[in-house]
A protein has these predicted regions:
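Extracytoplasmic low-complexity segments
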Residues: 11, 17, 23-87, 187, ...
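Extracellular/periplasmic catalytic domains that process cell-envelope and extracellular macromolecules
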Residues: 35-40, 73-77, 98-101, 161-162, ...
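A generic structural motif
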Residues: 48, 192-193
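Extracellular glycan-interaction patches encoded by glycine-rich segments
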Residues: 94-96, 148-156, 187-190, 198-219
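Extracellular glycan-recognition modules
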Residues: 38-42, 46, 51-58, 87-145, ...
Length: 263
């Protein structure tokens, strides 16, 4: 009986040590992402399902998407990703107010080869609000304000399209747009000022009204706040998965309940 009691106490002690370690790790993760609040995300699509026709939104908004056409699962920058055929492959996300934002950060990991490039390759698009794409010889993201297109060519494609993964990001705070690649600021544009246009429309990944994307896309996110260069450097290093997992999921409570049940 004493041996069993000692065993139970030892088991509880080991689990408490594990719980403490998990809590400490969670606190450190929280500090790392203190500036990137998951609650400010309109949608975070990690593409880590690896199979099926549904991509889950890891934000609290549940803006899940559906695969359409020529899309297949491949290895990504972090976990799994989607490869688009440039013909009819895309992801459709239903319209939701959480994707209609006043200020914005639009971010995605992309991988493509120069030989795959065509004008109007759209990475992310919500009509008539915002778009991340490349056109002609440049990366061409931007927002729509007052019915006016407020984007411009930012960076020669040859800098990026080397069949390697690159993080591209666009921000707009109501007065100026900024563009980043791999966590580094590349340029700004103050052509438009005011609120981003809003309309009831789906969000698409891999297509828009100017064409279909050819290549792979991983970890797409829309935030309703403006992130900065330090934030993008964190995402470049760690990806978006840790941001989506910052808050506890109840696993510690379940573990503690199981311990009590065993004793």
């Amino acid at each position: 009986m004493q041996t069993q009691e000692r065993g139970n106490k030892m088991r509880v002690k080991c689990v408490l040590i594990t719980m403490t370690a998990l809590f400490t790790f969670g606190m450190l993760a929280d500090l790392s992402y203190a500036k990137i609040d998951p609650k400010t995300a309109g949608g975070i699509w990690l593409f880590d399902e690896g199979s099926g026709d549904t991509v889950r939104d890891s934000s609290v908004n549940k803006n899940n998407g559906t695969l359409k056409g020529g899309v297949k699962w491949v290895d990504g920058k972090f976990g799994k990703a989607l490869e688009f055929d440039g013909k009819d492959g895309n992801v459709e996300v239903p319209d939701n107010d959480t994707l209609n934002v006043a200020a914005i950060t639009l971010v995605a990991w992309v991988k493509s080869e120069a030989k795959q490039l065509l004008d109007g390759n759209v990475i992310v698009y919500k009509k008539p609000s915002y778009i991340l794409q490349y056109w002609s010889t440049t990366i061409n993201p931007g927002v729509f304000v007052g019915g006016q297109w407020c984007g411009s060519g930012w960076l020669p494609q040859a800098v990026m399209w080397d069949n390697d993964w690159h993080l591209v990001a666009l921000t707009y705070d109501g007065s100026i747009q900024k563009f980043y690649v791999d966590g580094v600021f590349k340029g700004d544009n103050a052509a438009c000022k005011g609120k981003i246009d809003i309309a009831a429309s789906i969000l698409t990944i891999g297509t828009g009204n100017t064409g279909f994307y050819t290549g792979s896309i991983d970890e797409v996110a829309v935030f309703d706040v403006v992130l900065n260069e330090d934030d993008f450097k964190i995402i470049t290093t760690k990806g978006l998965r840790d941001i989506a997992a910052v808050f506890p999921s109840g696993k510690i409570t379940i573990t503690w309940a199981n311990i009590k049940a065993q004793n």
